[in-house]
Amino acid sequence: AGVGAGAEVIVPPFTYIASVEAVIFAGGIPVFAEIDETLCLSAEGIRKAITPKTKAVVLVHMCGQMANMDEILKVVKEHNLVLVEDAGQAFSATYKGTSVGLFGKTGCYSFDFFKIATAGEGGVFVTNDEQCYKFADSFSDHGHDHVGSNRGMEQHPVLGFNYRISELHAAVGAAQTRKVPHIKTVNRSHKQLMMDRLKGIPGVGFAAIPDPAGDSATFLNLMLPDQAAAARVVEEFGKQGVSGFNYWFINMYHFINQWGHLKDLKSAAPLPAHHYQRPQDYNKLSLPKSQEVVGRLISFGIRCTWKESEVIELTNKIKTSIEKAMGVTAYA
């Protein structure tokens, strides 16, 4: 995306940490912006984080959902920024008929074991920019240009690393991807059943989905009234034997509160970020909206292998736990 030493890149504080590490190892300076109830960067948050040095935005579509693309694209175009999408957690999600990951200059998807389609490891990079494609193709394989049939005689237009996915992982990923439409259909049915049975609990809602028709339904994202209520519910889940959820607020990998090593930029060797002035002190960040949203969020991963009876049993346990923790009774 053209990001180099000292370029500022707007990133979310709620994402898998690799999204931010990529900026650092490209020589850029991460600048954290606020998310909103979509669980993704907000247009307002992006706008407030822009400086004359801002080069790009890394937009992460979290928890199976999508960002409000119309509003974000307006800001990106207005300020002539490069949009990079991370749809690792939202493969198969769409916004007004277009797959997330296809709005920016580049996009990526994950085949990690936790995703809707898995190859065990690896992922996919997409772009409509030919120059960007050729650069990525070479960069991912020690700079090889892959021209001709003799690997030993290939040219190296750029320096690169080894980010190759193996043939075995790629074959598994291709096979699994063909199953995604079926998985998505089943997941959406499970999620709707869970939402119907939980929507009557006073004070409990769901994360905002800008385009419900495009939801990948890989997660059920519950929003509690506040952080204290969420903590009580999580504690009650433990007592009731409810599992399969993430309370991201204390998650070591997905929320900035636990990223002490990143805040201190701990690395094996000096990085460009050590030598350039940063617009934010990562240890003194003020992101009240993000803290409020993630503090209230509890997400359940949805599995297409569940039987309807299992969905109902789990949902009943969730409902009972929330009612007990919050001292409320669901509406009929």
Task: Tell what function each PLM region has.
Residues 130, 225-229, 307:
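Helix N-cap motif at beta-to-alpha junctions
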Residues 11-12, 29-38:
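Short beta-strand->loop structural element characteristic of the AMP-binding/adenylate-forming
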Residues 37-119, 124-126, 131:
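Active-site phosphate-binding strand-loop segment of PLP-dependent enzymes
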Residues 143-152, 193-198, 234-298, 327-332:
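Conserved PLP cofactor-binding pocket of PLP-dependent enzymes
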Residues 90-96, 103-219:
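Active-site region of PLP-dependent enzymes
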Residues 1-8, 22-25, 31-32, 98:
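Phosphate-binding glycine-rich loop
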Residues 14-20:
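Conserved coil-to-alpha-helix start sites within the AMP-binding
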